[in-house]
């Protein structure tokens, strides 16, 4: 099916929001201009809505295989489509881990059969993510690994991390890291700060993250490797990354919507839906994340979509697993709490969720360019809705944002020229 989207707005190559039509033919973007006419195309009048590149998320957890009670590739990618995401990168903390040919081939087969959006799987750095034996990077790259990570756990052995970075550099691949120094975690369930002290909980100190990042940055410099830091959460981490970039080290970084919108002061009680890793930090950390995003220290926004069951989250804040869902709330949360409040511009938000992650990892995505795959998201910037977890397409309903009123909701997502998800009657 060919589509002609009429009367929309988009961000042009100069970074300005302007009026446009957009023609999709044979699964690709055929033309982006005003006043397009075309035969043999279904005309969809978007009536002033934003026509954005499909959103790109480099940090997601789809749980399959092994964790299908939390999420499946089918439910997770449908939730991604509802959130406007057309390309997502799936972390390897599944069971089994994609750490060898057999496991990666099985994962790719599942993706091919079930995914509603483009899914790029990470390959594990170490076998079973155990930190002691390196995987066969060459084979995993051949089978389509997006990059290498042991996300969920930090690689504790510096010699292992250095060897991994050297091998990845030879393959022109990135090493991506969840950064925690295990000897400093302190069996924590929240940030070590006012909230942990008030509730008598073990806290995870900020330095647990920043010291690990500092170590890895020096290793990346020695290996001449692209090193990407997951979900930055502390002021110290931002400072270390900023200094590394100024020194010319190949380091990039991401931040989550929840760390941009919340800090520990916003946690109302010992509610497990506010438990994520890294935890919500202090006000100074939150301010540093915003500053880092604006000055280019932090390159992109990624959701760290981490679904869990209601039963798992009901165990209490100390025993419940870390993580919140992110796909279906990301854009409206960021638009309402950052753009509408003047913290960043709409143009910047689009870039942080599209071209910045795509360019960082060399993906042909994130821009509405003629000839590229038609991965597109239509967003109604005026529509206001209350976040209701019962309506999530993800199996995971674990969110701290239930009841929040937000504007800027995706209403249609197109992947490869096909409608992957559409809000009922949204464009009529």
Swiss-Prot record:
Binds 2 Zn(2+) ions per subunit. Zn(2+) 2 binds at residues 151, 178, 231. Its cofactor is Zn(2+). It holds the Pfam family Amidohydro_1. Substrate binds at residues 61-63, 93, 277, 308, 322-323. It catalyses: (S)-dihydroorotate + H2O = N-carbamoyl-L-aspartate + H(+). Zn(2+) 1 binds at residues 59, 61, 151, 304. GO terms for molecular function: allantoinase activity; dihydroorotase activity; zinc ion binding. Gene3D superfamilies: Metal-dependent hydrolases, Urease, subunit C, domain 1. Catalyzes the reversible cyclization of carbamoyl aspartate to dihydroorotate. This is Dihydroorotase. It comes from Bacillus cereus (strain ATCC 14579 / DSM 31 / CCUG 7414 / JCM 2152 / NBRC 15305 / NCIMB 9373 / NCTC 2599 / NRRL B-3711). The lineage of its organism: Bacteria, Bacillati, Bacillota, Bacilli, Bacillales.
């Amino acid at each position: 099916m060919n589509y002609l989207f009429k009367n929309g707005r988009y961000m042009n190559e100069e970074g300005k929001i302007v009026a446009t039509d957009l023609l999709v033919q044979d699964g690709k973007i055929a033309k982006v201009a005003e006043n397009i006419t075309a035969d043999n195309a279904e005309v969809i009048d978007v009536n002033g809505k934003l026509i954005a590149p499909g959103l790109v998320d480099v940090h997601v957890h789809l749980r399959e295989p092994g964790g299908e009670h939390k999420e499946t590739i089918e439910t997770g990618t449908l939730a991604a489509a509802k959130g406007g995401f057309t390309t997502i990168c799936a972390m390897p903390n599944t069971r089994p881990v994609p750490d060898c040919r057999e496991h990666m081939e099985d994962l790719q087969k599942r993706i091919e059969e079930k995914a509603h959006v483009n899914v790029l799987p990470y390959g594990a750095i170490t076998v079973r993510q155990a930190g002691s034996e390196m995987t066969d990077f060459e084979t995993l790259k051949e089978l389509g690994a997006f990059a290498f990570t042991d996300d969920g756990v930090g690689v504790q052995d510096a010699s292992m991390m250095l060897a991994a970075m050297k091998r990845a550099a030879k393959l022109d691949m990135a090493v991506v890291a969840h950064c925690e120094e295990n000897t400093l975690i302190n069996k924590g369930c929240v940030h070590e700060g006012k909230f942990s002290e008030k509730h008598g909980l073990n806290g995870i100190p900020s330095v647990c993250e920043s010291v690990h990042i500092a170590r890895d940055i020096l290793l990346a410099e020695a290996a001449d490797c692209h090193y990407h830091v997951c979900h930055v959460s502390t002021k110290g981490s931002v400072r270390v990354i900023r200094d590394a970039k100024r020194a010319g080290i190949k380091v990039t970084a991401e931040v989550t919507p929840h760390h941009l919108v919340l800090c520990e002061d916003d946690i109302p009680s010992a509610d497990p839906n506010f438990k994520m890793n890294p935890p919500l930090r202090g006000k100074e950390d939150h301010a540093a994340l915003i500053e880092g995003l604006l000055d280019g220290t932090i390159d992109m926004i990624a959701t760290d979509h981490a679904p869990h069951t209601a039963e798992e989250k009901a165990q209490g804040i100390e025993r419940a697993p870390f993580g919140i869902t992110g796909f279906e709330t990301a854009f409206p949360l960021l638009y309402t709490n950052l753009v509408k409040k003047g913290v960043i511009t709409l143009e910047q938000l689009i870039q942080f969720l599209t071209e910045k992650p795509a360019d960082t990892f060399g993906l042909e995505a994130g821009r509405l360019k003629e000839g590229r795959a038609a991965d597109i998201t239509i967003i109604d910037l005026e529509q206001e809705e209350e976040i209701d977890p019962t309506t999530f397409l993800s199996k995971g309903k674990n969110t701290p944002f239930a009841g929040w009123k937000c504007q800027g909701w995706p209403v249609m997502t197109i992947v490869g020229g096909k409608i992957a998800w559409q809000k009922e009657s949204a464009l009529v």
